[in-house]
Amino acid sequence: MATKVEEINKLKKKNLHFRQCSADSLSNSSMQFDLSGLNTPVGELATSNLPSPAHPPFGELHQESRTSNSSAMHIENVVASRLMYNEVANGSFALEPKNILVVTKPRKHSLVYKTAEITKYILTIGTPETKVYVDMRLARSKRFSAHNIAKEANTDIDRIKYWNPYICLIKPSIFDLAITIGDNSTLLYTSWLFQKIGPPVLSFSDDDVPGFLTHFSLSNYQQHLYQVLTQNVSLRFCSRLQCSFHKYDEKTKQYSLASTTYSLDEILISRGEHPFISNLNVYNNSELMTVVQADGLVVATPTGSTNISANAGGSLVHPALNAILVTPVCPHTLSFRPIILPDYNVLNVEIPLDSRSSAFFSVDRHESVEMHRGDYLSIVTSHYPFTTIQNPGYQWTKVLEDKFNWNVRERQKPFSRKPSLSDVKDTSDDKFDITDNSYCREFSADIDG
């Protein structure tokens, strides 16, 4: 029987379809790979015979031993996947995309015009087989105008296609590259479109300032697109969380899987509209870790550590690290502090049967789903990371400095008694006329008195 290492090596050769380039084509990078046709083979990953971890019902989960086969298998799969993707990330790749998806931020007319410019540029410099898929709601848009784009690019209008979420769900492997035009929420929406496998993503920031997820400036889109379409690029695989929602049936005392969602940023469990604090049982690898009494709980990836988790007091974690962040939101006691766990751990968050009220959970800030007494979430690291194209000039710490205004705030200065230009002729005493901001709304009618 083939060993686990042999299965992983076979899977890499079969599904990822890496073909090392000849020695003559090697440039500055020590390794180069050809990623043409990457997504079609990767689509077989979902049906491959690689064993996947089994998650038993919650009622049995906390009774399992720490050395259970399912936990060991999950750890083995996560570590093997991590090694596989780390090996890929060390090379440079020639994408050679044929079908390019463009995701545009809504409610902003200027980005529709920019989508038209990018579409025309891709059709101009791309091969005759290159097709661009834009949001189907732009089909009748006068700002986009597919006929004008095809005419100005001197090409066939059939090269401009339209996508909707259903196409991304049933045929994710037809896309070789995805381009996002907007902000972090646009990239999170793209992650939602491709819940499992998906194309590499080139993310443009709409405010021309790189963000935590949007690494490229929109003002220089021609330079970045030319490099991606004609040269080798580096990829980064951002870990995602798999969140499985299990519902409890009071009559049968059984659990049923209601939904499974993949998170790039975080999973937020909150009390929602209820006046009571949330009461949550948190299990780590089948053992009760703590009982959370707080306004909520955030389970985040390193990519999402700068979002809600940071607002709740969680640590900032570099997205290249492999970890799961668990952060309470306004805990009732200080006994539970933010914690960082290995990415191969299995977390289960349960609503106790004696809880005063239900709770709500949301994945990447999408619509909230109510959890009733007995329901639980099973959260593990997904085997389907989110692939982004790296910007060589992007530095995560630099973005922290810009977004969080590090080293920008002026230090408090001492009171100065030196006369300013407007005070040169002032012969009054040294007292301040206005000592502080007044918050009193009641003033005397006679201000001269």
UniProtKB/Swiss-Prot annotation:
Q: What is its EC number?
A: 2.7.1.-
User: What GO molecular function terms would the record report?
Assistant: NAD+ kinase activity
Phosphoserine, modified sites: S420
Q: Which domain of life is it from?
A: Eukaryota
Q: Which GO terms describe its biological process?
A: NAD metabolic process; NADP biosynthetic process
What is one Pfam family matched by this protein? NAD_kinase
Say where the protein is mainly found.
cytoplasm
PANTHER family linked = NAD KINASE (PTHR20275:SF0)
Q: State the protein's name.
A: Uncharacterized kinase C24B10.02c
Its source organism is Schizosaccharomyces pombe (strain 972 / ATCC 24843)
Taxonomic placement: Eukaryota, Fungi, Dikarya, Ascomycota, Taphrinomycotina
